[in-house]
Amino acid sequence: AKMVVVDIDHPDIEAYIQWKVREEEKVAALVTGSRIVSRHLKAILSACVNCEGPEGDCFEPMKNPALKRAVRDAKKAQVPENYVKRVIQFARQGYTDIEFPVYDTDWDSEAYLTVSGQNSNNSVRVTDAFLEAVETDGTWDLRGRTSGKVTKSLKARELWDQIGYAAWASADPGIQYHTTINDWHTCAAAGDIRASNPCSEYMFLDDTACNLASLNLIQFRKPNGDFDIVNFEHATRLW
């Protein structure tokens, strides 16, 4: 996994906020669409194969009532017409079954492998100035990264609502409070903290390592059940 952080005044911030939502919607479309198409194509093929009329009539919707219904239902469900024609041609060639891939919403499924953004944690970097604009229903300027010029102005609450909806719909983006984080910065003279590791436990300067550590707390349990505070404090200082 990786962490991707974009500033709230970035000119592409709206597309970034909606990125994961759109990709999740693609998965929903793939899963639902594949099931609908598969069901209707099989129904069309079945109407051709199980026809009891003259052989030539079995593949003509105007002469095969069951096929006519199946084709009509498929068109109502928005199944592409070329697929409808193709499966009828398939039946003419003597085939009695058809394979059409059906996708599911499993995290490791092919549907998710076809969309982007699945290997990153996305967060938006917000400042106190932006939050104040949200609170007062003010406008917010998006600025070019190199020129600093305003590329778009919009209501701060509109942007905030986009963040809220996207987080509800797809669990991304997260929020990083830039002003607060840097108010607590222990090395402020070295520059701003602008991002974190993927889970946001560790925040520090650009291009510095994220060396996470853990302690087995059971090792600090004394024989009488008390917690060994002295040794625990010593261990934490080592990190």
What would you call each of these model-derived segments?
Residues 1-234:
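Active-site cavity-forming subdomains of large catalytic enzyme subunits
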